[in-house]
C-alpha cells in the first residue's frame, strides 16, 4: 500500500500514545524480527476465522491495527516500518498500545521507537515520521510497500537524516511532530456494538459514493522520492497572505492578526483546531474548498480468501460504511484524557473503504468526511489509563464547490427587458385586432382583467359605478378590445347581460335592439334605434324585427341592448375582420401615436450616406427601455462623448414615431431640453445622436437620496422652464415622468424622450398615451386634453421626490382608477413640508384642467424662490450619480 506523508493535513489528531526510547544493539535487531515473523501465521489463521464469521454475520465490522517502527541506524539514517493488520470481528474491538523504554547506552548509533496503533491509517498516526520527513536537514525519503498476506500489510520507509546530536539540536522541527519523553505504558480498548439499522443506512450511503475504488493486487511495491521545502510548515505565513490578498484584510472577529494566526491558544486562532492552510479555509467558512484532483488508486494486499471482501465495487463500499457509527460527517477533534505530552499530529482527512486509502479526495485538505469519535473510561490499575479512540472514515464524495450565482451583465439584462417589453406589446396589438368583447358587468371581464381588478383591491361598488372608466384603463393595460354595453330590458329595468344570456336555453330565441350614442359627453340613451337580427339557434333562421318589438312567445326572450360610448370610444374605428392596418393604435399602451397626427419630422433629417463606424467609436450600452437602447460613444465629428439612441425602424408605426421624435428634437432648442445632433439610418435601425449627460434620471435620484424642499424646488424650476418653452409652441410632451427627466452632475435638469410629443394645434387630443402613474385625470377619462396634462405629470414627479415613489406605486390599475375618479392624495406626510410647497402642488393637481396653473404661472410662485444654490446642487447631484458615471467609464 502507498503511504503519503504531507505536512498540510487538515485535521489535528491528538494521539494518546506515550513514547519511550529503547536502545537496542544492531546484533539483536534480527532476533526481534524473527518472533514477529513466527507470529504472522498465527495471525493469518485468526484472520481467516474472523473472515468466516464476517460472511455469516450482518453486524460484522472491520478493525485495523497499524504498527509503526522507527529505527535510527548509523549516524545519518532512520528506518521506519509501518505494519497494518485488518481483523474482522462481529464487534468493533479497538486496542491501542504503546510501549517503549529509554536506556542510556554508550552506543548512540542505534535507536528504535515502536508504536502499535489501532485502528487508523499510517498517515494519521505517524506524525513523528512526517516531522522527520519535513525536517530541513532531510534531502529525500523513499517509501516501500511490501505485501505480506491477505490482511497484513507492512510499509517500510527509509529516510536519510543528520546525526542524532544535530537532530536533537533542531528542536523546532522535532517538537512540531513529537516530544519524546520517557513515560509509562498505555493500553486503550473499546467495544462498540453497531445496530443493524445503522449498517443498512451506511450500506446505502456507500452505494452512492463516488470514492475511487482501491486497486487490489497480490503484491505491490511502490517507491517514490519526495523533496521537501523548509517553508513547508510555515502555515502562519500562508494564512497571513490569504487574509491580506484574498479577503482584503477582512477579519471575522475582533481579534488581532497575531491572535488569528495563533495555532496554540484554544480560545483564539484560525489554525488551532485544524492547523495548516486548510485550517483557516475552514475558519472563514464561506471560502470554497480547493479543486478536487483526480483520484489516486492505492495498492492493497488481498489474497484468494478475500474474494468476497474485495475493496472494489459495492461490496467495498458496504464494508467501509460499517466502520462509521452515527456521527456527523464533518471532522471532530478527539482530545486526549491522558496528562502525558501529546504527539502533535497533522494529518489528511483520508477516505477509507475497508482498507486504507492513501490520498484525500480534497487533495490533502478541505473538509473531508472522515470522523473521529472518542469515548474515555478510566480503569483501575497501577499506572494504566484506558482510553478509546475510534477513527472512522466514511466513503462519500467530497462536497462540490459552492455554485456562485453570477449577476447578469448590464447588457444582457437590458436586452432581456427589451425583449420582454417587445413581447408584451405584440400581445397587446394582437388582442386589439380581435373582435370586441362586450362588457355589461364585472363578471364579463377576461380572466387577466379580473385578476388585475382583484389585485387592485378597489371596492366593487366603485368599480360598478365607474365601469365606463375602468374599461379604457383595462384596455390600455392589457390590450383587450373591451366595449361597455349597458343593458336595458323591455320593461325599462336594467338587467345583467350575463344573466340574460344564461337564462336562455337551446330552444330560446334572443331579440336584441342596439342603439349608438354619438354624443361624446352625454351618456344618455339615443332614441334612434337600429334594426337587429333575430337569431334562432336551432333553426338558423333570421328575421327582421323593429326596435322595441316584444316577442310574446313563451320560448323567446326579447332584450334591448343599448351601448353608450364615451369620448375615448368614439374615436375608435369599428371592428372589421380585414382591418389589420392601424386598429392597434386605438388600443395602445401609450407608445404609439394616432394615425391622424402627422409626424413632426421628415426623412430629410435622416442621414443615410455617412459611415457610422467612422463617425462613432467605442460604443457601450448604458440604458434601455420601451423607446430602444442608449449607447455611449466617442464622436470623431463632435470631438466629445455623445449618446446614441437606437430604435427599430421597420413598421409604419415605428417609422412614424421615429420621425416624430426626430422632428421635435430638431425643432426644440432650449437649455432644459436635450440637445439633438443628427440621425442615421443603419440597416433597419435609426440612430439618434444626442448630447451625453453625465448623471442619471430623476427616478434614480429619488430612490437613492432624500431631497429637501430647496432641492425639489431646484428640480421643479428646471422642469418648468423646459415645459414653458414647449407649451409656448403648443407642444404637449404627454410622457413627462421621472424616467424622462435627466439630472447631470453639472446641476442641469433636462427633458428627454420626445417620441409621444404632439402639436396641440393639429386636432383635439383624446388618445390615452404616456405612463400610468403620471397620467392626468382627463386623459384617463378619455376627455380632451392639452398642455395642462403635462403640468399634472410634472407634479407627480415632485411627489416622487418628496415621498420616494409616485402615488399607488404597487398597482397601475389602482393609480389610474383613483386618479380618474378621486384625483391625487398629495404628500404622504404633509406636516414635514411647508405650506408653500403644499399650495404649489395643489395648483398643479387640480382635477379640472382649465383651473390648473400653467408653467409660466408656477415659475412665479413664491415656493420656487426657495430653490437651492446651483453650486450646492452640483455637489449633491455629483454625489448621487458618481457611481453611474464610474460604471459607464468601467463598462
UniProtKB/Swiss-Prot annotation:
Biased composition (Basic and acidic residues): 45-58
Required cofactor(s): Mg(2+)
Name of this protein: Probable serine/threonine-protein kinase mkcC
Residues at the active site: 735 (proton acceptor)
Taxonomic classification: Eukaryota, Amoebozoa, Evosea, Eumycetozoa, Dictyostelia
Pfam family, one: Pkinase
Record's compositionally biased regions (Basic residues): 422-432
Underlying gene: mkcC
GO molecular function: ATP binding; metal ion binding; protein serine kinase activity; protein serine/threonine kinase activity
Domain of life: Eukaryota
Reactions listed under catalytic activity: L-seryl-[protein] + ATP = O-phospho-L-seryl-[protein] + ADP + H(+); L-threonyl-[protein] + ATP = O-phospho-L-threonyl-[protein] + ADP + H(+)
Source species: Dictyostelium discoideum
Biased composition annotated in UniProt, kind: Low complexity: 29-41, 61-70, 86-105, 297-314, 322-360, 379-397, 495-522
InterPro entries, A to Z: Kinase-like_dom_sf, PAK3-like, Prot_kinase_dom, Protein_kinase_ATP_BS, Ser/Thr_kinase_AS
EC nos: 2.7.11.1
Annotated region (Disordered), positions in chain: 24-70, 85-121, 264-435, 495-526, 565-588
Entry similarity comment: Belongs to the protein kinase superfamily. STE Ser/Thr protein kinase family. STE20 subfamily.
Keywords: ATP-binding, Kinase, Magnesium, Metal-binding, Nucleotide-binding, Repeat, Serine/threonine-protein kinase, Transferase
SMART domains according to UniProt: S_TKc
One Gene Ontology term, aspect cellular component: cytoplasm
Record has DNA-binding as a keyword: no
